[in-house]
UniProtKB/Swiss-Prot annotation:
It comes from Bordetella avium (strain 197N). This is Ribose-5-phosphate isomerase A. GO terms for biological process: D-ribose metabolic process; pentose-phosphate shunt, non-oxidative branch. It comes from the Bacteria. GO terms for cellular component: cytosol. Pathway: Carbohydrate degradation; pentose phosphate pathway; D-ribose 5-phosphate from D-ribulose 5-phosphate (non-oxidative stage): step 1/1. CDD domains: RPI_A. The active site is at E108 (proton acceptor).
Amino acid sequence: MLTQQQLKQQAADAALEFVEQVAGPDVIIGVGTGSTADLFIDGLARFAGRIRGTVASSERSAQRLASHGLLVLDLNDVQYMPIYVDGADEIDANLHMIKGGGGALTREKIVASVAERFICIADESKLVDRLGAFPLPLEVIPMARAAVARSLAALGGEPRLREGFVTDNGNIILDVHGLSINDAPALEARVNNIPGVVTCGLFSLAGADVALLATQNGIRRLSR
């Protein structure tokens, strides 16, 4: 039986096949953050010199990309990316996701929005019938912490400060437990409209285009 780490590697390798299809001297690849994304980055190293470069969704990923000799570009200098590859903490059959366990949700959402296709890579344990067992992360302006927490409690959630964590943007993370997510796009829009919320970790208004889920029997592919 394959371990979870081996399944993550399988998913990362499957995403590299998409890179192979689009690779070229002018191509820029968007790259996410997290343990599965790290494996994708390590595999992407073989494309150094075959693609123009990358855009990273976090300082952590940028450092790992650079360590492999891959050029890391500022998103402001990029007009087109064919694919963005990232993991998920949860994903459902609609390709809606909860992301942000690593705290990079805002930059992940921004970089993903520029790419033509979002390719989600994960092991099969991340596929759920309904989102919400994994606490929903929110990036929040520090001065708004208490006000945002009250608004989330009114929605039925239990917000908890991620102690000692500061995002790459200088903000805090609230992890919200116990939210009932029956309509992910509606909840995403509602939470994002709370003053002080930079963004929430629901990726449903713009979810993944393709999910590559590693199973004991190979890759299961879901697409829109």
